[in-house]
Amino acid sequence: MLILLSCAKTIGIPKRLPSHLTTTSPIFDEQTTKIALAASSCDIKELSRLLRINRKLAEENHRRWQHFFEDDSPTAPAALAYTGMVFKKLAPANFNADDWLYASEHLLITSFLYGLLRPSDMIRPYRMEGFAHLGAPVEDEVFNFWRPYLTDFLIEKVREKGGELCFLASEEMKMLFDWKRVEQAVRVVTPLFKVPQPDGGLKQIVIYTKMARGLMTAHLLTRRCRHVEEMQLFSPEGFIFRPELSDESNYLFVME
């Protein structure tokens, strides 16, 4: 089984890294360089428009892009650099050496700048969006740019791990791939986390979903789970698997 997570918008470079956590280089260096070149050619106003962010964030990320290619630009393994709720609950800094190695072989993280990342891949601080339409040398929307590179790569990696993909990423990340091809080539199972409402319905609450995704990922990795069915036995943040509300492609967990 392979697990797919989304990147986080927030990044922080730790001052110290646990010595037992080995590091690797990102896979799609050539493509990343093209996106970084396109982004670094943008001024603050252009970044604000392309990324749909306020001026303060645009100024911060303009500085990041201007220093992106410098050798002393800070870096950290992707799983430790991303600071969103998913990664807080994943808590990769607590992994032992064997957990870390296993995670680097069974977890991929989507990224609008780096394409697909292993947890151990060293990254720099950045902000990018899939909907951004970049100039030269990309000349395309980021989603479209990545699709030809990532689709076959993901299918191959899932097949190497037994042909099962646990999709714990956000829906928009499917646009980085030809998702119909992915679903035809491998088995995709999406865990859904919902909360009961006063009217009797069920609703997905973003913060709870992110927490559950991080905990579920940590569980699957540290327990060395090989098949998607094994996640049914785990109850992250009080979410209980409901087989009567699930099907072969969607596993529904409801908060008790």
From Swiss-Prot:
Superkingdom of origin organism: Bacteria
Name this polypeptide is given: UPF0246 protein PG_1544
Listed GO CC annotations: cytosol
Native species: Porphyromonas gingivalis (strain ATCC BAA-308 / W83)
Gene Ontology process terms (BP): response to hydroperoxide
InterPro entries recorded: YaaA (IPR005583)
Short name of one Pfam family: H2O2_YaaD
HAMAP family for this protein: UPF0246 (MF_00652)
Family: Belongs to the UPF0246 family.
